[in-house]
Design a protein with these regions (language model features):
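Duplex nucleic acid-engaging cores and interfaces of nucleic-acid transaction enzymes
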Residues: 1-171
């Protein structure tokens, strides 16, 4: 109760605890080592999932209306197709990470003793940090990396095909 201070807009014990959880969540999300581990786990064990916004709509993206593939096996042309389908509002695309493993990892890093008062608060802070702060950022990073690699691959194929076309003898 010593942290309750109406002058600082902390009017109850619950508000004080919620404020502490927010601070902990922010701190956890700023830990570079945690982000590196979570990103690696998401790339190795996560899945790219796409679903139709309207299953009755006909489009060239129908094969992606109920699609799922491991992040680390997604071909470049599929990344580009998923991006187009999302941009054209036929698909919703997300990365599903191994959330249970990630939360266990964070809890193991954050909780060093089993205290009946602090353990539940730290678990909630870990989950909030992951779901609200870390997961969206990691998903954006991974999707951006996948898109960049896919675009580089497409340019490379185009370059190779153009070179072959230009090196053909002229038709006389």
């Amino acid at each position: 109760e010593e942290y309750v201070n109406p002058k600082k807009e902390v009017n109850s014990v619950k508000e004080a605890i919620d404020g502490a959880k927010d601070i902990i969540a922010e701190s956890v999300s700023d830990e570079a080592d945690y982000r590196i581990w979570i990103r690696k786990a998401t790339v190795q064990h996560g899945k790219v999932i796409s679903q139709a916004k309207d299953e009755n709509a006909e489009s060239v993206y129908e094969m992606y209306y109920d699609f799922e593939e491991p992040v680390n096996r997604l071909a470049g042309h599929r990344v580009l197709a998923l991006n187009r389908g999302e941009k054209e509002k036929f698909l919703t695309v997300k990365i599903e990470a191994p959330q249970d493993d990630i939360l266990r990892y964070l809890e193991k890093k954050m909780i060093h003793s089993d205290n009946p008062y602090t353990t539940p608060i730290l678990k909630e802070a870990a989950e909030d940090s992951y779901k609200r702060l870390i997961a969206p950022a990691i998903e954006r990073e991974i999707r951006s990396d996948l898109t960049e690699k896919a675009e580089d691959g497409a340019i490379s194929v185009f370059k190779k095909n153009l070179h072959q076309l230009l090196m053909q003898p002229p038709n006389v």
